[in-house]
Curated annotation (Swiss-Prot):
Protein family: Belongs to the anti-sigma-factor family.
Signal peptide location: none
One BP annotation, GO: asexual sporulation
Species assigned in the record: Bacillus licheniformis (strain ATCC 14580 / DSM 13 / JCM 2505 / CCUG 7422 / NBRC 12200 / NCIMB 9375 / NCTC 10341 / NRRL NRS-1264 / Gibson 46)
EC number assigned by the record: 2.7.11.1
Name of the protein in question: Anti-sigma F factor
Catalytic reaction list: L-seryl-[protein] + ATP = O-phospho-L-seryl-[protein] + ADP + H(+); L-threonyl-[protein] + ATP = O-phospho-L-threonyl-[protein] + ADP + H(+)
Superkingdom, taxonomy of origin: Bacteria
Keyword Nucleotide-binding listed: yes
UniProt keyword Acetylation, yes or no: no
Function: Binds to sigma F and blocks its ability to form an RNA polymerase holoenzyme (E-sigma F). Phosphorylates SpoIIAA on a serine residue. This phosphorylation may enable SpoIIAA to act as an anti-anti-sigma factor that counteracts SpoIIAB and thus releases sigma F from inhibition.
Amino acid sequence: MKNEMNIQFTALSQNESFARVTVAAFIAQLDPTMDELTEIKTVVSEAVTNAIIHGYENSGQGNVYISVTLEDHIVYLTIRDEGVGIPNLEEARQPLFTTKPELERSGMGFTIMENFMDDISIDSSPEMGTTIHLTKHLSKSKALCN
């Protein structure tokens, strides 16, 4: 059975934990393993932080949009902003690349997303924002119920 959730919140750093916990609570109905749940929470944290820090340049202006679809033990996750966009997506996806070294950003956000999820695609246009589509196939172990 297909199940969907959509949330929208102001692009403030303090809302990152709300996004992470909300997505994790929704996904918990599929009984993911602790590792799977931790990986998804980490990916949500990275993508939302990117939207807030880079997309909206930590201005507190704008919204972050998250949609989650669950179907047949597959998690489809979309995280979107309407911020400044990514001028060079190929460069941004390189490990350790950051546009904010003064904020001590590691430049590993996209690398983490790519390693923790089964599929990732990124659409971004200058001054139009960024949309990240992520997919994760969950095991069917019912690990959290045992």
